[in-house]
Swiss-Prot record:
Family classification: Belongs to the universal ribosomal protein uL16 family.
Record has Nucleotide-binding as a keyword: no
Domain of life (superkingdom): Archaea
Record-level GO BP terms: translation
Protein name per UniProt: Large ribosomal subunit protein uL16
NCBIfam families assigned to the protein according to its UniProt record, in alphabetical order: PRK04199.1-1 (NF003236), PRK04199.1-4 (NF003239)
The keyword Ribonucleoprotein is annotated on this UniProt entry: yes
Pfam families reported for this sequence: Ribosomal_L16 (PF00252)
Protein source organism: Aeropyrum pernix (strain ATCC 700893 / DSM 11879 / JCM 9820 / NBRC 100138 / K1)
Length: 174
C-alpha cells in the first residue's frame, strides 16, 4: 500500500493518540537523530536560526527526516561539519491511523467501507501549533545567509506555512 499524501494528515481534530502501550503494531519513526553538528561550540556561536510554524497541524515523521537530511547536507557542504549545530525540537508522538481501502478500478462495487472506521497504525506525526519552533540552527556570525537557505530548504519539506527567524546573541529577533 503506497503512502498517502500529506494533506490527508496535516490537519487534526481531537486529542492526540499517543498511548503506545495500548496500541499494537506502531511502526518506528523514520527520524532517529535529532541533533547534528558541533554541540560543544554552541555556546560560543553568535547567531541562531529558527523555523517557526504559523499554523496548527501535524508533521509526519518522514517529513521531519527529509527536512533533517536537507538542512544537514546543505550546512555541511557550505559551512562545514564542525561550524554549526542543528537540532530538531519536536518529536512525532502522535500515532497516525489509516482505514485501508481498495483503490483499483471497480473497487466501489466490492466495498462500501465503514462509517467512522478506526483504522490501523501506519506512522507517527508531531503536532505543532502557531509559534512552535521546529528546527533550530546555531552558527557563526557571517553565515546568516547559509542558515536562512538551509532552513528554507527544510521548510519546503513541511506541509504547513512557516517563518524563518534569525536571532543574534544578546539581541531580539530580526
Amino acid at each position: 500500500m503506497p503512502l498517502r499524501p500529506a494533506r490527508c494528515y496535516t490537519h487534526f481534530s481531537g486529542p492526540p493518540y499517543t498511548r503506545r502501550e495500548y496500541i499494537h503494531g506502531v511502526p518506528p519513526p523514520k527520524i532517529t537523530r535529532f541533533e547534528m553538528g558541533n554541540r560543544e561550540m554552541m555556546e560560543k556561536w553568535e547567531i541562531k536560526g529558527e523555523l517557526v510554524m504559523l499554523e496548527a497541524g501535524q508533521i509526519r515523521h518522514n517529513a521531519l527526516e527529509a527536512a533533517r537530511i536537507a538542512v544537514n547536507k546543505y550546512l555541511a557542504t557550505t559551512i562545514g561539519d564542525k561550524n554549526f549545530y542543528f537540532r530538531i525540537r519536536v518529536y512525532p508522538h502522535h500515532v497516525i491511523r489509516e482505514n485501508k481501502m481498495m483503490a483499483f478500478a471497480g473497487a466501489d462495487r466490492l466495498q462500501d467501507g465503514m462509517r467512522q472506521a478506526f483504522g490501523k497504525p501506519v506512522g507517527t506525526a508531531a503536532r505543532v501549533y502557531p509559534g512552535t519552533v521546529v528546527l533550530e540552527v546555531w552558527a557563526r556570525k557571517g553565515d546568516e545567509e547559509n542558515v536562512k537557505e538551509a532552513l528554507r530548504r527544510g521548510a519546503s519539506k513541511f506541509p504547513l506555512p512557516s517563518r524563518i527567524v534569525i536571532r543574534t546573541r544578546g539581541a531580539q529577533a530580526s
